[in-house]
């Protein structure tokens, strides 16, 4: 491609504009640390400015049509507890990005295996919360992160946006649901409940809004904004409850299996779902319900997590969850823990 002097000048100007925007927004964030509403507004303004200058992704070219065979199924990816920004002896933001990319590549690989028997043209993604680590969840957290909350937000948005765009290259349609986690709390508080701001304002929801706006041009993508602490995911006749899991209290340093089952047995009576998906406890588990459905607890991306080792006595092996769903019969037909 022939590049003119004008192209070089325009590119340099775009870089200069982006650098100026970054400096200005970082200055706004520093002056807004004590004022949560201003901090949130600064994040939104930074996202809009960056999108205006750098642009948003053009519509992804759909995959080539495949020869139809078998009864179609749907890939369901539970991507949760990515904790971008957290640092352990074997985990940081760069590792988080690598593991998200690995999750997507393994999802595509396992889908192609399924496609040898039947069509899998649609993918549903559940973003299960705790997308970032943030810096104000507990007192010493500033010593266990590699980026500010502001930087974590935009790293998470960039990483997850890239993941969704990759899925759009492989699936005819993609659908995304989001649920907020306790690490999304804005300001002081306990768990997900903030003392400084209403609970609807949550870093996970803000990340979701940034990504949703940036992917607005993707006509094959259905983006479901988070309206509550949970989402109901519908895949044909299959209906699932998705939530982070932090509403279920644990005591004595153990994963509260009884509490998990008890809560879901109550919720199913008026939410009417087959299965449930949650994270939060950083350990894999599945529990049966009386209605014949199951509760799937998905691990996190974090390895060597002090929380998992000290609080729930779990090994903290990084993994995510991929299921395949028969939308006509309303049931899961194949289950994978995607080890990372």
Language-model features: locations:
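Core catalytic region of metal-dependent phosphoesterases/phosphodiesterases
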Residues: 62-79, 93-208
């Amino acid at each position: 491609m022939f590049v003119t002097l004008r192209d070089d000048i325009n590119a340099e100007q775009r870089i200069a504009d982006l650098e100026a925007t970054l400096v200005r927004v970082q200055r706004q964030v520093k002056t807004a640390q004590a004022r949560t509403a201003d901090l949130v507004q600064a994040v939104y303004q930074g996202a809009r400015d960056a999108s205006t200058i750098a642009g948003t992704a053009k519509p992804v070219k759909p995959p080539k049509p495949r020869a139809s065979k078998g009864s179609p199924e749907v890939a369901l990816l539970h991507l949760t507890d990515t904790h971008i920004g957290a640092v352990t002896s074997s985990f940081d933001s760069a590792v988080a990005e690598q593991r998200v990319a690995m999750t997507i590549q393994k999802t595509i690989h396992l889908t192609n295996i399924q496609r040898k028997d039947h069509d899998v043209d649609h993918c549903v993604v559940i973003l299960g919360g705790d997308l970032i680590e943030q810096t104000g969840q507990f007192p010493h957290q500033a010593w266990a992160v590699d980026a500010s909350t502001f930087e974590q937000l935009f790293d998470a948005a960039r990483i997850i946006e890239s993941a969704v765009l990759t899925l759009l290259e492989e699936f005819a349609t993609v659908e995304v649901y989001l649920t907020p986690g306790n690490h999304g709390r804005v300001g002081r508080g306990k768990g997900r409940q903030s003392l400084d701001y209403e609970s609807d304002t949550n870093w996970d929801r803000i990340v979701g809004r940034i990504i949703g706006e940036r992917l607005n041009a993707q006509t094959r993508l259905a983006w479901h904004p988070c309206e509550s602490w949970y989402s109901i995911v519908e895949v044909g006749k299959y209906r699932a409850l998705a939530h982070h899991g932090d509403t279920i209290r644990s005591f004595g340093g153990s994963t509260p299996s009884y509490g998990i089952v008890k809560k879901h047995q109550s919720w199913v009576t008026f939410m009417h779902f087959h299965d449930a998906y949650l994270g939060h406890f950083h350990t894999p588990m599945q529990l049966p319900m009386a209605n014949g459905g199951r509760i799937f607890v998905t691990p996190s991306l974090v390895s060597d997590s002090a929380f998992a080792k000290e609080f729930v006595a779990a090994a903290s092996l990084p993994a995510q969850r991929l299921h395949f769903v028969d939308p006509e019969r309303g049931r899961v037909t194949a289950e994978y823990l995607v080890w990372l």
